[in-house]
Structure formats: structure tokens, C-alpha cells
């Protein structure tokens, strides 16, 4: 008996993939330079089937990786060549929508945007909005604690998930809820990148759509001036739904790709979106425009319609893909710095460009200090890829040096596990490992992700006997 | 002072009791390192420890099965770092929320948590969270927490999260420790996201017959920061909604029109954010709950999180609530199961085993002996 026999007993033939050509479809997620062909792919349709696969993995000592839509940017869904890839794409039912409770219950394969689409006509929406929201799955959002441009005001996935049904790495189906008295296991599970189990049912909070939404595009001569405007807006006590910034190189790329029509010669553009009750939005918009003018903005455009708003966002949302127009290859970085250090860190990135002869386009969620530097390189030029990799890593060092983080929303995955010891001590990582061992003592759930070196769980230590120390 | 550690230790007395259990000693560490030294010594001696802050909720949840050392964090009351431009603050866990509010107000900022007891500390607010009205808008303590420094039962100092508002590196131990009642270790330092103090505030209050009357407010686009109900055992039920921001007055007036009545005030009603009396129970219910005779309920219609007093038989009330509602006896004497169903309890037990295998950290304060 092998794990294959067991899987073939659980699933009909069309939902177990062993054909090498078809397996290669799943060899990477959105981070394409890490690839591995899974040993086998299964397509469960129910939590019971997920539990059965996971139990089979436990029985045969085989690792497993869960995958939603495969849009992740840190290799969190990178398969194991010795493991089972559990793809949730067939679990895409919206199980219930209850507007009195302002809740929806959905399966993990449902796309982020599908939740909003299901309730939009009634005036509700699901707040977290990662750029990939048209295709990314809510199960993946839970694993990665996904953010998005609007998380500045509304928070991340973890602030919007109220309960989960999970399959633990032992194959048990367990519910964890914010209503459970005791440890916030829900908060620990969201963002654990698939290392604590697989979410099979997700209860999300629905929010009433704001009465008014307005979007402002402000152009600046320099990125420093744009940064000053951001600080002043936040300092004035205004909390916009989103504050996004792009530098000249990112603007150039977006223009080439989607003709977004941002003001020519801008050294930086800010996109500020305000939402809420109409009187608040109107007074805040006037204040934000005044701040932008005072900090040197030479042009401001306010979207007068939903179409104009979409046009302003188009340049920003296409920015990652757009750099493909101005560079043969690029690395998308994801670091965070305290907002007050933005200027210093951008100067540091500038210095790195000069030192290594590598161009960096900057796109960022300026309101919360989340940088997405796009490190551009020519993969056919000898040594350039390596230099780009060094620059990318040095940017993370800058973030850590300024008290920030190595990832704001893309996750650690396989990509940044090696950077974890730069941000955390061994004691910190060992303590996190205790959580891992509580959920997954066998280390079968998405092994090799998040943590730099595999740690064995061992037995729960036995009670020590000793004498009181010298304090007591 | 004992030994070379210089940590202040005194004998425990009845005033130091946790749910009636009197500790043998009280330790008063003044730094993170001293917390670690004390816990290391307790590990050597096999001593049971319960952390305490403002002691406002020590009577909540179950008493510890055993208690040798009350670890009093009230001497750790410093603001370690406050960068106003980042809207972030890092504090020692023993600082009171009132003191922190004073410091932050000087910069026109606040930690947007409504804490029901004066004297409650940050550590206690995390370890034993209490619901506050504005959780609807700003979230609970766990939602505003960015980073944490904890000390484990063996004295290990560990950090998680950070001091930026957006960060997904590593497990969020801060959230795990939220609601832990001292059973996983000691929360020694915490970092929070702050908010600017609102330019203006208005409360709309109105008396009502049923709980559903307030639904129109939640379906509106007026964005109240809180919608609270005060349902006394006898007398009229009152609903109050808070509006914040420069246009608070306009929105409160608009809300009055939506409801067809009510009064707008510049101050909160006297019962706002205050728990009803003992015996005290926590009720979570997302639809209008059945409320038994003689029971008073206060809390958020918007989040479905309430505190209730006057209930004697928890099981009887539970049987009248929806299946996904939760009723837990917090403080006082109850008949019936204090905890009710907690589907994730087996997982909590496994976490407890990994963090505190010797069961020395506040053993038995939570359900199932956790």
C-alpha cells in the first residue's frame, strides 16, 4: 500500500493528477524562480476529502502543501517533489451570506473579489483587496494574511476573518473562532502560511459600503516632497482609505504599459483615496489638497466619476507587470519601514542603485510604510541577476535597520526564510516553533516555509524536579 | 531584596489573592530582564506563577489550581518609545491604560481601546481582554497590537511582530497570547498602532422596545464608531451610538432622522462602556439574544459582544441562545457549565503543553484545566 493507492481510493481518477506534464502546471506560484514538480496533485471538493488526504499523508509520512489560485509572491505554495499538493480550486462555493450578521461563509477556493460581488448589490463588501483580488483565493488570503491598498484604514485579512474550519495536520476537522474563550488561535492561524493546517471554511466580516469615495492624484517634482505630503496628511489626523506612491521610473513603466496619463515630468505621484460619510470626505479632501499644494504638488486631479477613479488606479495596479515593458526581468520586493523613515530608506535605495548599477522602480503603500521596490535587471547580462539579488537583500537590511519588517504582505514563504534570523533571534524563532509543534508535531504541513532551518519538535518535555532558586 | 538578582520580593497576603488563592510570595520586577530572572528561578523551584497588573480582572475566569508567586508588573510602567509621526507606541506591560492615554493625548493621539476599569494595565488588557464599545470601528486589543515581548515559563525572552503597522513575518505570538490569562507566559512589553484623537464626538441615545430597532443604524452609511445597548433587568432599554470626526454632529443628526427620534449629546451616557455588576458573564451573539428575567445586558449591538449580570444558571440561558452564541461565566458564582462549548479547546491544550509543559503558569485559569 502506498500513498498513491490511498489517494486513488479517496478520489475519482479525474481528481488525482499524476501525469508529469499536468503536474508541471503546478510547479510554482507567483514567485516563478522557485520551481518543484509535486509528486501528486489532488483536487478535493469537501473538507472531509481534505481531511482524508491529510490523514493519508500522516499515515505514510508524506508532506503536503495547500494551494489556492497560486498567485502568492513568496513561494508559499511551492510544491514538494516528495509531497502531495492539495489544490482548493474545486472548493469555490459561497455557503451563506447573512447581512443581518454581516457575515459570509465561504469555501477556500472562492476568489477574494467573488465575495464582494455576491453582496455588492445590497451595498456591502469584503474589505481586504490584494491587487490580485480577481483571481486570488480567500484560502490563500487566510494563509498569507493578505493586505491590499485599502488595509491602511481597514486592516488585513486577520481583522476580517471571524471563524475558520481547519483541517489540522493530523487530519482532524476543527473550528476556531474569535468567539472562543482563551487563546486567539484564529489570530495565530491567519498568516501562518499553510504551516499549521488547511482552512476549509472561512467566515468573513462584510462591511457596509461607504457613502462617498473620492480619489485624488497629486503630482510632485520629487519623491521627498511626496513623502512630506504623506507625513503631513497623517499628522493632520486624516486616515485615508489608501495612500499610494510611485516614483518616476514606476510612472514611466505604467505609462508604457497602460497609458495611464499621469502628469508628465512628475518625480512622484501620490494616489489618496478617502471614503466614508459624505460630509467627512468632502472636508478631508479639501484638507488633503491643501496639504499637497503646501508641500509642493504641481498638479492635483480629483476623480469625478467611477471611470476616472478606475483610470487613476489603473496605473498603480498595473505597476508590477508594467515594469516588464522597461526591463527584461525584475524582482518584486516587499519590505516595511516606519513611515517617518521613508525618506532615509529611499535615499539608501538610491545609493544602492548607484553602487551596484541596478535600477529600482519604487511603488509603495506610503501610508503604512510598505515598500514594493522593483529591482530591474537583464537576465541575459552576466552577473546582473546576482547583483539584483544582492540589491534586493540589501533593501531588506535597510528595512530591518530602521526597525521595519522583511515582509508587509507577501509573506516569508520559501523566498525569505533565510532572512528571518536577521529580524528574529533564535529564541524568538524557537518560541514560534512551539506553536508549530502544537499544531504539527510531525512537520508535514508545508515544511521548508517561513522558518530557516527545520527544527524537530520532539516529545513534550517532562516535568523537572528541583529546588527553589536563590530568589525565593 | 533577595539573592544577587535585586528583584523585590515580599510575602503574599489576602490582598494578593487570585480568585481566592493566596500566593506565598509577590515579586515586583522592574525590567524585562528581571521578569526573566524571576521566571527562571520559579522554573528551578517548580513554583507556580500568575502575572498581575492593575488587578482589575484577577477575579475573572477560574482561580489558578496552585499559586506560589504573584508576578506583579506594576513597577514596569514606562513608555519605551513613542514616535508620534508613525502613530506607534511601545510600552512596558505594567503601564495603566489611563496613564498611557495621558501621555498620548499630549500628541493628539490615543490607543483606541475602551477599557472598562480605571487602573487596568496594558498587559492585563491583552491577557484578559474586555469588550469596549469602539471595537466596532477600531477592533479589539488584538487588532491594534503590532508586536509583543513575552517571557516564557523557563525565563526565555521572545519577541514577535514589530513596530510597523504592516508586517507578516513569522507567527503572530501577540495574538496567541491575547486572551491567555497568564497561562502561556508573561506579556512584558507591547507595541500598538495608535489613532489620532477625533476632532469631535457625539452620542445619539434613544429608548427602545426591542433590540432590532437599532438595525437601521447599522444598515446606514453614517459609520458610527460604536452602537451600544443598555438592557437593564428592569426598566427601559437604551441604545446609544457614537459618531466621531469633524462632521460628528451632522452624522448624529442624520442618524436621529434615520431612527425617527432620540437625543444628541456631547457626552457619553453614564453606563457607556461600564460593565454591569456581579455575577458577570460574557455573551457573544450576533443576533438579538433572548435575555432571561432578572438579567441585565450591556454591550455592542454592532459586534455582538456583551457583558451580562444577574444570570445564575448559565446552562439554562445557553439552551435559549443560537448554537453559535457563546456564554462564559467571568466572575462570581454560577450554576451550570462555566465555559460552555469551546470547539478549539483540544488545540489550546496542545499549545499550553508546548509553552508550559510543567503547568506552572496560572494553571487551570482557562477551560479544561488549561
Predicted regions and their residues:
Chain A
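N-terminal flexible segment immediately upstream of the FAD-binding catalytic core
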Residues: 1-55, 72-102, 131, 248-259, ...
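Conserved, mostly hydrophobic/aromatic
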Residues: 57, 194, 440
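FAD-binding subdomain of flavoenzyme oxidoreductases
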Residues: 93-97, 103-246, 463-472
Amino acid at each position: 500500500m502506498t500513498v498513491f493507492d490511498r489517494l486513488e481510493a479517496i478520489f475519482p481518477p479525474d481528481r488525482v493528477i499524476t501525469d508529469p506534464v499536468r503536474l508541471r502546471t503546478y510547479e510554482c506560484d507567483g514567485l516563478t524562480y522557485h520551481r518543484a514538480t509535486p509528486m501528486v496533485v489532488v483536487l478535493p471538493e469537501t473538507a472531509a476529502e481534505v481531511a482524508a488526504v491529510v490523514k493519508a499523508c500522516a499515515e505514510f509520512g508524506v508532506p503536503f502543501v495547500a494551494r489556492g489560485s497560486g498567485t502568492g509572491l513568496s513561494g508559499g505554495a511551492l510544491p514538494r517533489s516528495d509531497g502531495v499538493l492539495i489544490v482548493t480550486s474545486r472548493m469555490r462555493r459561497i455557503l451563506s451570506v447573512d447581512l443581518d450578521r454581516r457575515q459570509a461563509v465561504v469555501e477556500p477556493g472562492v476568489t477574494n473579489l467573488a465575495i464582494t460581488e455576491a453582496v455588492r448589490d445590497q451595498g456591502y463588501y469584503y474589505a481586504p483587496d490584494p491587487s490580485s483580488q480577481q483571481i486570488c483565493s480567500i484560502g490563500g488570503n487566510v494563509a498569507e494574511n493578505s493586505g491590499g491598498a485599502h488595509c491602511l484604514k481597514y486592516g488585513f485579512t486577520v481583522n476580517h476573518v471571524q471563524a475558520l474550519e481547519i483541517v489540522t495536520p493530523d487530519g482532524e476537522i476543527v473550528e476556531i473562532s474569535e468567539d472562543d474563550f482563551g487563546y486567539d488561535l484564529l489570530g495565530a492561524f491567519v498568516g501562518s502560511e499553510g504551516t499549521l493546517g488547511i482552512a476549509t471554511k472561512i467566515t468573513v466580516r462584510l462591511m457596509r459600503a461607504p457613502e462617498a469615495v473620492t480619489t485624488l492624484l497629486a503630482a510632485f517634482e520629487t519623491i521627498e516632497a511626496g513623502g512630506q505630503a504623506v507625513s503631513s496628511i497623517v499628522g493632520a489626523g486624516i486616515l485615508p482609505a489608501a495612500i499610494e506612491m510611485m516614483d518616476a521610473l514606476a510612472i514611466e513603466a505604467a505609462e508604457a504599459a497602460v497609458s495611464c496619463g499621469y502628469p508628465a515630468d512628475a518625480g512622484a505621484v501620490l494616489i489618496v483615496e478617502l471614503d466614508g460619510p459624505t460630509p467627512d470626505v468632502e472636508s478631508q479632501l479639501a484638507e488633503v489638497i491643501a496639504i499637497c499644494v503646501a508641500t509642493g504638488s504641481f498638479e492635483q486631479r480629483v476623480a469625478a466619476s467611477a471611470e476616472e477613479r478606475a483610470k487613476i488606479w489603473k496605473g498603480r495596479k498595473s505597476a508590477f507587470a508594467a515594469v516588464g515593458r522597461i526591463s527584461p526581468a525584475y524582482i518584486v520586493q516587499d519590505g516595511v519601514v516606519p513611515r517617518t523613515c521613508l525618506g532615509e530608506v529611499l535615499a539608501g535605495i538610491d545609493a544602492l542603485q548607484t553602487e551596484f548599477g541596478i535600477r529600482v522602480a519604487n511603488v509603495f503603500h506610503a501610508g503604512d510604510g510598505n515598500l514594493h521596490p522593483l529591482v530591474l535587471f537583464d537576465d541575459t547580462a552576466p552577473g546582473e541577476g546576482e547583483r539584483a539579488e544582492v540589491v534586493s537583500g540589501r533593501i531588506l537590511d535597510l528595512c530591518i535597520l530602521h526597525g521595519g519588517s522583511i515582509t508587509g504582505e507577501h509573506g516569508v514563504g520559501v523566498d525569505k526564510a533565510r532572512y528571518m534570523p536577521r529580524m528574529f533571534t533564535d529564541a524568538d524563532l524557537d518560541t514560534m516553533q512551539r506553536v508549530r509543534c502544537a499544531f504539527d508535531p510531525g512537520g508535514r504541513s508545508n515544511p521548508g516555509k517561513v522558518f530557516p532551518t527545520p527544527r524537530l519538535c520532539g516529545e513534550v518535555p517532562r516535568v523537572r524536579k528541583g529546588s527553589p532558586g536563590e530568589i525565593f | 531584596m533577595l539573592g544577587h538578582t535585586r528583584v523585590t520580593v515580599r510575602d503574599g497576603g489576602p490582598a494578593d489573592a487570585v480568585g481566592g488563592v493566596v500566593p506565598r510570595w509577590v515579586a515586583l520586577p522592574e525590567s524585562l530582564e528581571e521578569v526573566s530572572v524571576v521566571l527562571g528561578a520559579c522554573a528551578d523551584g517548580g513554583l507556580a506563577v500568575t502575572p498581575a497588573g492593575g488587578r482589575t480582572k484577577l477575579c475573572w475566569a477560574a482561580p489558578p489550581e496552585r499559586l506560589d508567586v504573584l508576578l506583579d508588573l506594576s513597577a514596569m510602567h514606562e513608555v519605551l518609545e513613542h514616535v508620534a509621526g508613525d502613530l506607534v507606541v511601545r510600552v512596558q506591560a505594567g503601564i495603566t491604560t489611563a496613564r498611557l492615554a495621558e501621555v498620548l493625548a499630549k500628541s493628539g493621539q490615543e490607543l483606541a481601546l475602551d477599557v472598562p476599569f480605571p487602573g487596568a494595565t496594558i498587559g492585563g488588557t491583552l491577557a484578559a481582554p474586555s469588550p469596549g464599545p469602539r471595537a466596532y470601528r477600531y477592533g479589539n486589543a488584538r487588532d491594534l497590537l503590532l508586536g509583543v515581548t513575552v517571557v516564557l515559563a523557563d525565563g526565555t525572552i521572545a519577541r514577535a511582530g514589530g513596530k510597523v503597522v504592516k508586517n507578516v513575518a513569522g507567527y503572530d505570538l501577540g495574538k496567541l497570547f491575547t486572551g491567555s490569562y497568564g497561562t502561556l507566559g508573561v506579556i512584558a512589553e507591547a507595541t500598538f498602532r495608535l489613532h489620532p484623537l477625533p476632532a469631535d464626538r457625539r452620542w445619539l441615545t434613544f429608548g427602545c422596545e426591542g433590540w432590532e430597532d437599532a438595525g437601521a443604524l447599522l444598515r446606514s452609511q453614517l459609520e458610527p464608531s460604536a452602537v451600544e445597548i443598555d438592557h437593564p433587568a428592569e426598566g427601559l432599554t437604551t441604545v446609544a451610538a457614537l459618531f466621531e470626526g469633524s462632521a460628528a454632529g451632522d452624522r448624529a443628526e442624520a442618524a436621529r432622522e434615520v431612527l425617527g427620534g432620540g437625543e444628541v449629546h456631547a457626552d457619553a451616557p453614564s453606563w457607556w462602556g461600564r460593565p454591569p455588576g456581579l455575577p458577570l458573564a460574557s455573551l457573544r451573539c450576533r443576533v438579538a439574544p433572548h435575555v432571561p428575567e432578572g438579567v441585565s445586558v450591556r454591550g455592542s449591538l454592532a459586534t455582538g459582544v456583551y457583558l451580562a449580570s444577574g444570570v445564575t444558571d448559565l446552562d439554562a440561558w445557553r439552551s435559549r441562545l443560537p448554537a453559535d452564541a457563546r456564554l462564559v461565566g467571568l466572575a462570581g458564582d454560577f450554576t451550570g457549565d462555566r465555559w460552555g462549548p469551546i470547539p478549539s479547546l483540544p488545540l489550546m491544550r496542545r499549545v499550553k503543553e508546548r509553552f508550559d509543559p510543567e503547568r506552572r503558569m496560572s494553571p487551570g485559569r482557562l477551560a479544561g484545566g488549561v
